[in-house]
């Protein structure tokens, strides 16, 4: 997917990008490739692959959820900034918070945010387990996203404490897994969430599968969650 194809395919979905936004995506691509030579940010570095599997993939969340107003979104374990930074470029009024446990990624993201001139983006070097216990962040976000390989029961413990009541946790997955969702339902309920739906679609050109698991926060998460670093992964809620 070349940049102009990216623009046209988003326009077909009702998302019109300005020349300035296209320039920001171009800067993003070049910074990603440049910094990737110093640190391992992504295995995907070809321009057409980055535009498809990082940029388009991230913005595809907006095909199913409304990011057009000044909502607050927290991206847990954002890595090189996906999906939150592409969403921020497309929807400048979003308030974005990113938490990542690797300081080198935060260093890259700080440079990226500055170079792209993005306002209202906060970056935190922290473990999700400790970040989620901080009063100013608990129940503070309209949307919390995770584009990670961890299982849904683990991700739910890291993400749901941050979601405000009636807000949403959006888990981006590469494949459909009813078994994984069913396994996670007790944890989701314990954490105050409710499974809403799973949306499946395919990326253009490659037809790679993508799935978004949508979980709504219905009540406050008990104070004991998230547990200490490492525990959610070692002993998932059953």
Curated annotation (Swiss-Prot):
Location(s), subcellular: Cytoplasm
InterPro entries the UniProt entry points to: rRNA_ssu_MeTfrase_G, SAM-dependent_MTases_sf
Residues that bind S-adenosyl-L-methionine: 77, 82, 128-129, 147
Signal peptide range in chain numbering: none
Principal place of residence: cytoplasm
Cellular component GO terms, alphabetical: cytosol
Pfam families: GidB
Location of region: Disordered: 217-238
GO molecular function: rRNA (guanine-N7-)-methyltransferase activity
EC category: transferase
EC number(s) recorded for this UniProt protein: 2.1.1.-
Keyword terms: Cytoplasm, Methyltransferase, rRNA processing, S-adenosyl-L-methionine, Transferase
Family note: Belongs to the methyltransferase superfamily. RNA methyltransferase RsmG family.
Purpose of the protein: Specifically methylates the N7 position of a guanine in 16S rRNA.
Protein name per Swiss-Prot or TrEMBL: Ribosomal RNA small subunit methyltransferase G
Gene: rsmG
